[in-house]
């Protein structure tokens, strides 16, 4: 047995295990409780739960040589075992539909689009807050509720691509992501908020020309970077209402996507909003 530390949270684990049932949190409980009591005792358990999720994510993926899994991270963000998709009926029925459609039509791209926007019938949640809520960002909730913004739909699509070895990337734009599908001889852009409509790169540049460009746009996001961006979006949901929780998500975002400038900016804002006694 060995241990790793994340701040004041120490996790003991057996080598080779996922460590989900071997978390030692006594010291962390006391520390977090004393700090969060000033806000409200009601904030303690949710904040602790999120902190453990983040620590477990670091434990599972920090320093690992293999590529991070979109599917496993979808489960981890929901405080489930990494293999949770095995028991989700709608997910498995969707993959079966995709496989049968490809076998019947030999059209992988259309089968992929039909899965997302016909079989699962995922709809755009709407502009503004509905599209950036946890219900619209976390892919397992998107699959359950059939509503999504660009992040949630893209994450779900990337999970399918991972499971079926499709060449699919998430592409960053100012405040947005879209999907890029590559076949043997063609490349297609898929707009997640418009049921896979294909804008050209030039059309995207025109649509987002007034956004905050970072230099990271139009480059395929690595899995860790996409997961970091999702953590950043979730942190933003709590920036006004639950600063400790926002900072916890920003810490994960910073770990996985350190090059994204918005993370540091919002972290600084959140830290300034903490009471002096914390």
What are these regions (language model features)?
Residues 13, 21-22, 29, 34:
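Short hydrophobic targeting helices and cationic amphipathic motifs
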Residues 1-6, 31:
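N-terminal basic, low-structured, amphipathic or hydrophobic segments
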Residues 6-15, 19:
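Short Gly/Ser/Thr- and charged-rich N-terminal loops/segments
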Residues 41-278:
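A structural boundary/capping signal
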Residues 4, 24-26, 277:
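Intrinsically disordered, low-complexity segments enriched in proline/serine/threonine
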């Amino acid at each position: 047995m060995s241990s790793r530390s994340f701040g004041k949270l120490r996790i003991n684990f057996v080598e080779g295990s996922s460590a989900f049932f071997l978390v030692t949190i006594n010291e962390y409980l006391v520390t977090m409780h004393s700090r969060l009591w000033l806000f409200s005792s009601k904030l303690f358990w949710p904040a602790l739960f999120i902190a453990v999720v983040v620590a477990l994510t670091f434990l599972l993926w920090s320093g690992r040589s293999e590529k991070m899994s979109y599917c496993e991270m979808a489960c981890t963000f929901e405080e489930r075992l990494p293999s949770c998709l095995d028991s989700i009926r709608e997910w498995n029925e969707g993959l079966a539909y995709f496989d049968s459609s490809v076998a019947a039509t030999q059209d992988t791209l259309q089968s992929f689009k039909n899965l997302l926007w016909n079989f699962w019938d995922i709809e755009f949640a709407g502009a503004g807050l509905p599209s950036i809520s946890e219900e619209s960002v976390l892919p397992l909730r998107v699959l359950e509720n059939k509503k999504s913004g660009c992040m949630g739909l893209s994450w779900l699509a990337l999970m399918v691509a991972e499971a079926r070895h499709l060449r699919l990337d998430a592409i960053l734009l100012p405040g947005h992501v879209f999907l890029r599908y590559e076949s043997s001889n063609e490349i297609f852009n898929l707009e997640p908020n418009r049921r896979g409509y294909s804008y050209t790169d030039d059309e995207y540049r025109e649509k987002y020309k007034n956004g905050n460009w970072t230099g990271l746009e139009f480059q395929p996001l690595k899995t860790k970077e996409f997961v970091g961006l999702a953590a950043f979006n979730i942190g933003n949901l709590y920036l006004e209402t639950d600063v400790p929780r926002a900072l916890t998500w920003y810490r994960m975002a910073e770990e996985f996507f350190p090059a994204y400038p918005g993370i540091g900016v919002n972290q600084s804002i959140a830290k300034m909003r903490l009471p002096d006694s914390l």
